[in-house]
Amino acid sequence: MSRGYKKTYKKIKRVQRETEYRRKGFPKRTLYLVLGIVGGAVAAAIIAGNLLVANKKEETNIETDSNIQMGGVSRIPYIDMLTEHDTIYNRLTGYASKNFSKDDIGYTYAYLPSDRRQKIYISVTPDKIEKLSFQVRDPDNGVLVEENQVTEISEAGGKTVAVITVKDLINSGHIYNMQIKLDLKDQPAGILYNTRIADTQGDQIDREIRYINEFTGKVFNENETEFISKATYATDSAESSNYAYADINSATSLIMWKGMSAQMQENPVPSVIHSDKDTVVLTQSYPVTYKGPGEKEERVIVNEAFTLEREGAKDEEEEETTSVLREGEYGPKLTSYERKAYETLDARDLSITKERFCMGLQADEKVQCMSSETGQYICFVNGGNLWRVCSGTGTEKGGFVRLFSFEGDDGVKTDITELVDVNDEGKIKNVRGRNGIRILEVTDDGDVTFAVYGAFPAGKHEGESGIGIYRYYTKDKKLKEAVFIKASKNLEGMRKLVNECYLNDYGELYITTDSQLKKINIKNYTLETMTRKAVNDISSHSEDNSKYAYATQDYGGAGLASEITVYDCDTGESRAIREGDEGIYLIGYMGGDLVYGVAGVDEIERNTGGTKVYLKKIVIADKDGNEVKFYEKDGEYFSDVYIENATVAFTCYGKNDGGGFVKKDTNRLVAREEGEGGGCSLRFDASDIRRRVLYMDFTKGANDSTGEDAYLLDEYEYMDGNTVEI
């Protein structure tokens, strides 16, 4: 094993699995300390340096002068869209920003009414609103089509009813981006909401939404078995499976949660995410309770995706009196359905038994977690909350601590899903809450460093959007905020910032924004730009984010660079990589080692289908730039290169008599050995009424504990003036 790998192995020995993250067409390896594959934005963990260095007495830099409750009444309203027939759909959540943003694209799809008067509900009364305005942009080029203020505002049922009138400036059938800006009287920054709109010339979505509402209203009613069987391809067969997952082919007992006494706690608001003349894809999320072991009520968040064929619809009058769910005779027809549910843990239920604890109903193993090197402490995220559990094998008594939660006085839970992300087949990729949490470090003393990002609904930063860096100290059981980074970005934009951040041992936090690496000093709260802008956005981070490689000179496009510069976030030093007159193709990082390819102008193939590069050589270089491994073979060229686990995968090509490239076979370059396992693992096991539930195991041992040992933090300490704006 080369010395270039050893330090990386030491840092990543807690890793149980790894996942691949791709960025702007360039395969990129980012280390996620998770057990399971993390998409978005469900979460993952970044390895970082200590927040504060004890022997340098830097702890004084976050001595605080105030305490603040984590929870409270949310000051970030939501917006619901309404159809032409006043059917509610597409609940929009916002983020703080002083100005409109032309780069944001909405996830939901709204049908404009035939008169282009789009009605919306806002979850605050009109007397709280200073101004309401909107922009419409062409997504193809970002050109502003319209910007106007909304003046038609009234109150109904404790909410604001507003009408957005879109002028006759958009083309029929073309999809546009709409951004709504809400300015509140008691909030300095505005709140932005994004969606997509289209003039559908009277075509509406009411039939499809009523289909979903009818399905949802009956799916947990055991008297409606025949109804659900006709709506899906379900059967009455017994099925020993996971209640948290179901699709259109699952047994009715699984889809309907028979024997679970399931009860919906809120009526869901469906979101349209794709629509054309033949097909509509909708998603929704809502809380459900069921009777668990001992008849105790448990809470689960259900996430669903529906694909509907739009065929045989009858007129509006007939639909009002007749069900739209009868074997596709008319109206929409369900062609795909998927459900993923995730249980929210209750402190009273948390206990360690036989070196493991139960996480209840979970659709998969996508749990963000990290353990200390000794395995005595495990941190994990569940239901928008951050937990730390102690095994009890050391000096500290075993048990659970909830380190962070936005659950507050307004009754809004932190586990509510705000976005159900689906793939092209209508299957659920991941689900995202209104905030994200990223675990940065768990020490052998039980101290935890983590980041919270998104629109802060409560606490000191309520109404603001940004990233907070926090540290929990085991000795005094206190949580302290080190720095707050105010960022006018949506949740996905902030997720990207956090995924690529790095905190070194000197209290310097590195983030990448606008294709540049920037440094935030959390001792004096200054922001400094450390690198030039990456050419053609060609860049990559090492798995622990301590190294940042970026293109500094172009090489005729095609994703090639004449020079790649590597910046070290621990030392502040840079080094350049060149390959003579050849171009460099940045593939990504594997551990702390940089992987890149080499090609010349003759290896760039340009045609009507696009541009493709064929590499003559693949190089793996350590942190000092030394080649630790390379692959090169006379007469062979390599393309379709990506990093997967501990290998570099690629396709081999040769040249024909005409000089064209011809595919030969596929190959892999083994780059390194696997690291050591962590202090925890996840696995499903048989249960009673719930069939299968997820358990987290302590791989290095644990003593039994009970839920009575759980400790819930409800406040954190902060210091005024610790805010940096980017």
Task: State the predicted function of each range.
Residues 1-30:
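N-terminal Lys/Arg-rich, disordered targeting/topogenic segments
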Residues 273-288, 302, 448-452, 594-599, ...:
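A short hydrophobic beta-strand element
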Residues 163, 168-171, 278-353:
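Exposed beta-sheet edge and beta->alpha loop/turn motif
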Residues 139-158, 402-406, 483-488:
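Solvent-exposed serine/threonine-rich low-complexity stretches and specific carbohydrate-binding patches
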Residues 33-50:
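Hydrophobic membrane-insertion alpha-helices, especially the h-region
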Residues 392, 475, 521-525, 568-571, ...:
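Short loop/turn segments that connect beta-strands within beta-propeller blades
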